[in-house]
Swiss-Prot record:
Residues 1-101 are annotated as: Urease gamma. Pathway: Nitrogen metabolism; urea degradation; CO(2) and NH(3) from urea (urease route): step 1/1. The keyword Transmembrane helix does not apply. Heterohexamer of 3 UreA (alpha) and 3 UreB (beta) subunits. It is found in: Cytoplasm. One of its GO terms (cellular component) is urease complex. GO terms for biological process: urea catabolic process. HAMAP family: Urease_beta, Urease_beta_gamma. It comes from Campylobacter lari. This is Urease subunit alpha. NCBIfam families: PRK13192.1, PRK13203.1, urease_beta, urease_gam. It is an enzyme of class 3 (hydrolase). One of its GO terms (molecular function) is nickel cation binding. The gene is ureA. It holds the Pfam family Urease_beta.
C-alpha cells in the first residue's frame, strides 16, 4: 500500500477527527485542535459521499456549537479551509465562522482594571539633571544601572549609584546631542545585585562596593 504525502496528511487528520468525535460523544468539550479536526473529519466524510461544495459550506457551520467546545475556542476558529477530493476533482472548501460565537471568553481579549496602576508605588525617588555632551543621541532603558550609562552623559553619578530610571518597564529615555533634561531615579529592587552593564559594579549595592565602583568609574573616564 502506497500513499502520497497529501494522503498521509488526510489520514492523520481523519484519525485526529475520529478521536475528537469520540470525545464529543462523551460530552467532553473540545479544544482548538480537536474542534478543527472534528469539522474537517466530518467534511471529508461528506465529500466522499459527493455532496456539493455549497452543501458542505452550509453543513460545516452546524457541526459544532459553543457548548461543544472549551470557552474561547469559538472565537479562535474564524475560518476553516480544506482541500477535498470530489468525483470531478479536488476543490477548496471554506467555512466562515464554523462555530457560532457566543463565548463569554474571547481569545486574546483584554480586561482593563477600573483602578489606576501607580507606577513604582512606595518607591523613594530622586531627580537629577542630565546633559548629553556627545554628538550622538543616547537612549537609556528602564532597568539600566544609571550610574553606568554612557560616559558622554554628564550628571552627578554618585547620586545615581544603585538606581534606575523611574519609568515603566521596557520603556526608555532618549537624550539628544547637547540636550539637558531632568530625570527621576529610584533604587533597584530584589537582591540589589548589579551585574554587567559597563562592569563598574558587578556586585551587591552597598556602601563598600559604592566606593569601589566610584574608583573604577574614575579610572574608566566616567567621572
Amino acid at each position: 500500500m502506497h500513499f502520497t504525502q497529501q494522503q498521509l496528511q488526510r489520514l492523520m487528520l481523519h484519525y485526529a477527527g475520529k478521536i475528537a468525535k469520540d470525545r464529543k460523544e462523551q460530552k467532553i468539550k473540545l479544544n482548538y485542535n480537536e474542534a478543527l479536526a472534528y469539522i474537517c473529519y466530518e467534511l471529508m466524510e461528506l465529500a466522499r459521499k459527493n455532496l456539493s461544495v455549497s452543501e458542505l459550506m452550509s453543513i460545516g457551520k452546524t457541526l459544532l456549537t459553543s457548548e461543544d467546545v472549551i470557552d474561547g475556542v469559538a472565537s479562535m476558529l474564524d475560518e476553516i479551509q480544506i482541500e477535498l477530493p470530489f468525483e470531478d476533482g479536488t476543490k477548496l472548501v471554506t467555512i466562515h465562522e464554523p462555530i457560532a460565537n457566543d463565548d463569554k471568553i474571547k481569545a486574546g481579549e483584554i480586561f482593563l482594571s477600573s483602578e489606576f496602576i501607580v507606577l513604582n508605588e512606595n518607591k523613594t525617588s530622586i531627580e537629577i539633571k542630565v546633559s548629553n555632551k556627545g554628538d550622538r543621541p543616547i537612549q537609556v532603558g528602564s532597568h539600566f544601572h544609571f550610574f553606568e550609562v554612557n560616559r558622554f552623559l554628564s550628571f552627578d553619578r554618585e547620586k545615581a549609584y544603585g538606581k534606575r530610571l523611574n519609568i515603566a518597564s521596557g520603556t526608555s529615555v532618549r537624550f539628544e546631542p547637547g540636550e539637558e533634561k531632568t530625570v527621576s531615579l529610584i533604587e533597584f529592587g530584589g537582591l540589589k545585585k548589579v551585574l554587567g552593564f559597563n562592569n563598574l559594579c558587578d556586585d551587591f549595592i552597598n556602601d563598600e562596593n559604592k566606593t569601589k565602583a566610584l574608583s573604577k568609574a574614575k579610572e574608566k573616564g566616567f567621572l
